[in-house]
Amino acid sequence: MSQILHPDAALVLFSGGQDSATCLAWALDRFARVETIGFDYGQRHLVELDSRAKLLDGLKTLKPEWVAKLGETHTLAIPTLAQVSDTALTRDVAIAMGADGLPNTFVPGRNLIFLTFAAALAYRRGIGAIIGGMCETDYSGYPDCRDATIKALGEAINLGMATQFELHTPLMWLDKAATWGLAQTLGGERLVDLIREHSHTCYLGERGARHDWGFGCGECPACQLRAKGWREFSAQRDARQG
C-alpha cells in the first residue's frame, strides 16, 4: 500500500538563492502547508544556506497568511557529492568553460540527487508536491536543469516509490527578468527587495561586494545572469511606471 500524500502540502528545494526564494513565495501562494529542504554538499558558496533564515523571517512579514503556512526547514548533509565531483563549486579552482561546452561549475547529478532526497523526505512526511527552481531559459546549460530531465526523473521517482508526487518547476520557462517580475507579482516591491538583499547567487560565496541586484563577485556565470535579469527587469519596470 502506497503512502498517503497530501496534495495541499509542498516541499520546496530552498538553497537561499534567488530562484528558490521566488519558488518558495510561489508555493506559499498556492499550498496550505509548505516545508523547505536545503543541501550541504561542500559547496564553496555555503553562505547561500545561511541566507535562508533571513529570507524565511522576511517572508513571514510580507503576508500574514504565509506565517501559518510555513512548516519545518530541513537541511541534509551529503558530503559524498563533493567527493565525487571535481568542479569549481566544490573545489578552489578558477571558473572556466569545459571542452564539453559546460562551465566547470556543473556538478554532475546534483539536481537528480537533490530531487530524489527531497522525494524521500516528502514521502515520509506525506507531502504531495515537490517544487524546484530549475530553469532552462536563462541558465548555464546544465543538463539536469532541463524540463525533459525533470519530467523523466519525476516519472522514475513515482514508479520507484509507488506514489504520485507532483513536481513543479515554476521558473522553467522564465528568464531572469521574468523571475524578478514573478517575485514582484507575488509579494510586491518588498519581496523584490528581500530577495535582492538577502538571497545569494554568487558561486564564489562573495558577500562583500554590493551591486544593484544584490551581493556577489559580479563575474561568475550566476552573478552575470542575475545582473542581466535585474537590468532588464528594472528597465521594464521603469518603462511601466514612466
UniProtKB/Swiss-Prot annotation:
Q: Which reaction does it catalyse?
A: 7-carboxy-7-deazaguanine + NH4(+) + ATP = 7-cyano-7-deazaguanine + ADP + phosphate + H2O + H(+)
Identify the coding gene.
Answer: queC
What the entry lists under Gene3D superfamilies is as follows: HUPs
Provide the E.C. number(s) assigned to this enzyme.
Answer: 6.3.4.20
Its function, per the record, reads: Catalyzes the ATP-dependent conversion of 7-carboxy-7-deazaguanine (CDG) to 7-cyano-7-deazaguanine (preQ(0)).
Database matches in InterPro entries = QueC, Rossmann-like_a/b/a_fold
Q: Which residues bind Zn(2+)?
A: C202, C217, C220, C223
Q: Which GO terms describe its biological process?
A: queuosine biosynthetic process
Which amino acid positions bind ATP, per UniProt? F14, S15, G16, G17, Q18, D19, S20, A21, T22, C23, L24
Q: Which cofactor does it need?
A: Zn(2+)
Give the pathway annotation: Purine metabolism; 7-cyano-7-deazaguanine biosynthesis
Q: Which domain of life is it from?
A: Bacteria
By sequence similarity, the record places it as follows: Belongs to the QueC family.
- Organism listed in the record: Rhodopseudomonas palustris (strain BisA53)
Please identify the protein, giving its name as recorded: 7-cyano-7-deazaguanine synthase
* SUPFAM superfamilies named in the record: Adenine nucleotide alpha hydrolases-like (SSF52402)
Alphabetized GO MF terms? ATP binding; ligase activity, forming carbon-nitrogen bonds; zinc ion binding
Q: How is the cofactor bound?
A: Binds 1 zinc ion per subunit.
Q: Does the keyword Zinc apply?
A: yes
Going by the record, the broad EC class of this enzyme is: ligase
The record ties this protein, via Pfam families, to: QueC (PF06508)
